[in-house]
Amino acid sequence: MKVRPSVKPICEKCKVIKRKGKVMVICDNPKHKQRQG
């Protein structure tokens, strides 16, 4: 999980979602997981 000021999809499987008011990227590749913070 990477915590970044700006989250962007890295590949075509990355999905940008909102959980509990936080913007997150979920993906099949665990290296692509990101959270805005």
Curated annotation (Swiss-Prot):
Keyword NADP: no
InterPro entries linked: Ribosomal_bL36 (IPR000473), Ribosomal_bL36_sp (IPR035977)
Superkingdom to which the source organism belongs: Bacteria
Cellular component, GO annotation: cytoplasm; ribonucleoprotein complex; ribosome
GO biological process: translation
Keywords, sorted A to Z: Ribonucleoprotein, Ribosomal protein
Annotated GO MF terms: structural constituent of ribosome
Family in the record: Belongs to the bacterial ribosomal protein bL36 family.
Protein name: Large ribosomal subunit protein bL36
Naturally occurring in which organism (per UniProt): Staphylococcus epidermidis (strain ATCC 35984 / DSM 28319 / BCRC 17069 / CCUG 31568 / BM 3577 / RP62A)
Gene name for this UniProt entry: rpmJ
